[in-house]
Amino acid sequence: KHYSEMLPVEYVPTDQYMQVYHNALKHYAKPVANAVGMLADKIIENKGKKMVLVSLARAGIPIGILVKRYIKFKYGINVPHYSISIIRGRGIDDNAMKYLLEKYRPQQILFVDGWIGKGAILNELKKDISAYEGVSADIAVVADPANVTELCGTHEDILIPSSCLNSTVSGLISRTFLRDDIIGRDDFHGAVYYGELTDSDLSYDFIETIEKEFNMENTPDLEKRVESQGIDEVINIGKNFGIDDINLIKPGI
């Protein structure tokens, strides 16, 4: 079966694991807020004030909310924000794209994600978006350690604390799924709501903790010459370990 046809059981993280998350949030709230501000400034500068933020589900959801809130904080603009499913090997949610394009001009749509690791989803997006004339395949991200986009808050490999958690920092929704026996031809891709995890939900806590660190002025990265892209590292790891499928290689700690 394709991974998009299955959903894992999601558990409440252990107290020890949650301590790691809270420590990460304490140490990285300010750098993440700074990067969100830098990203929002670049979005306004490059895309104007009429853009529509479209988060890639699900890691992009809290990031899109932070960018939306920063733009409201600094520029006083309440930009629309949506989330859309994109599944490696299955593509972007075509019905959701049609819905968006009935409401907005193609040039207004801007995709948002948390970070770019090796660029697999970016490549999927570029392939799919060519079918929608006028829609840009650019992704706005907080962190781009892969060095593939300038539309980012930082190229530093900062730890975005929301990456430590699953549904409990993303509004209690699962990653998206696509199964023919559940999802009809005219339906959006599916997701499950984990209501049983309500008592462990930290979605608003994460957003509000970062939001408290927002500044009107943000500190840009020192310009650094990009020597290589993250995908080059992944390919080299694959060669060294005899792994042909780069989807089996996950950049991380």
List the model feature ranges, each with a label.
Residues 1-51, 72, 76-253:
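Long, low-complexity, Lys/Arg-enriched
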Residues 66:
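Active-site signature of alpha/beta-hydrolase-fold catalytic machinery across serine-
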